[in-house]
């Protein structure tokens, strides 16, 4: 699943990503990603100082990105794209301790970012006429987490994309993000397709759960998945109190109830985590989950690259004809 929201308040964003708030950094340091990050010499772990600088529209050398003429866009310091693994994948990865599955999720996020960069656009004036230039680079920081707000196992990555990109003339400018958000459905499909291919290469079987390409691991049933969906049950109870089932509720009602019932994301110490994992393992045994699913041989790097390309092609093939034509024309 892919969700996203804009980061519009610089002061609030600074506290949101600080060690004090500890929302993104508490489960491990983030890593720099994207061709734009490479152009700025940003590699490896994310450091808080540079992270805040970039959110504020300043380059590592102190230069400030020129303000955009769009007042609304000027308030956007970046965007948080959150890629969440299917629940059964989270259960296999985090309770069984399957590092290969965790790595598959990370590679699928990278594939999605590579596709996002194809939609990176900046404004440029030529002879007094403003036009859009496809830049092909983004500056992003990826923070991988393992918990839902309800403390269920939930493997997900916050991909924070900064509001900047380098044009062909070497100048850094704010993003013109219309195409990026126009293709979020494609990005989510590409992530799911890549993840499915990587998991199949590991020997896991999957089952599709809808026509949009959502899937779960075949050896973990829906009933077993529900054992690790506390927040989902809270939402169901809230709907019952309103006299509705989930099927009858509108999307807005579901979103409002989800927000209203979302518990605070508290910090967890090492001991808390050990207790939590022990609890998960006990629940998985009670649910009858068998983690020792047979797996085939792991593919090499070349197979991974081919799987990534095939996954994106698969996602594109399932879009509308208009979207596919737009992508092919780039």
Name the predicted role of every residue range.
Residues 1-314, 319-323, 327-329:
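Intrinsically disordered, flexible peripheral segments
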């Amino acid at each position: 699943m892919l969700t996203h929201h804009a980061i519009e308040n610089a002061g609030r964003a600074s506290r949101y990503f600080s060690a004090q708030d500890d929302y993104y950094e508490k489960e491990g340091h983030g890593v720099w990603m994207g061709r734009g990050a490479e152009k700025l010499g940003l590699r490896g772990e994310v450091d808080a100082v540079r992270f805040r600088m970039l959110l504020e529209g300043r380059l590592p050398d102190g230069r400030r990105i020129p303000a955009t003429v769009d007042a609304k866009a000027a308030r956007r310091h970046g965007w948080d794209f959150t890629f969440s693994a299917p629940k059964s994948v989270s259960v296999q990865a985090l309770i069984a301790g399957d590092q290969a599955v965790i790595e598959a999720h990370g590679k699928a996020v990278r594939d999605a970012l590579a596709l996002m960069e194809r939609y990176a656009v900046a404004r440029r004036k030529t002879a007094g006429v403003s036009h859009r230039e496809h830049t092909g680079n983004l500056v992003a920081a990826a923070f991988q987490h393992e918990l839902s707000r309800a403390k269920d196992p939930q493997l997900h990555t916050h991909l924070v994309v900064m509001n900047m990109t380098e044009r062909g003339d070497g100048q850094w400018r704010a993003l013109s993000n219309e195409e990026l958000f126009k293709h979020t459905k494609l990005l989510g499909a590409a992530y799911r397709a890549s993840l499915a291919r990587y998991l199949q290469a590991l020997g896991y079987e999957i089952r599709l759960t809808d026509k949009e390409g959502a899937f779960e691991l075949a050896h973990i049933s829906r009933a077993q998945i529900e054992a690790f969906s506390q927040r989902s049950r809270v939402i169901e109870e809230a709907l019952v109190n309103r006299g509705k089932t989930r099927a009858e509720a509108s999307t807005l009602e579901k979103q409002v109830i989800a927000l209203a019932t979302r518990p605070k994301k508290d910090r967890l110490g090492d001991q808390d985590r050990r207790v939590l994992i022990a609890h998960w393992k006990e629940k998985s045994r009670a649910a009858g989950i068998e983690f020792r699913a047979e797996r085939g041989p792991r593919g090499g790097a070349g197979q991974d690259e081919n799987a990534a390309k095939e996954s994106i092609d698969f996602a594109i093939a399932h879009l509308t004809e208009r979207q596919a034509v737009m992508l092919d024309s780039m």
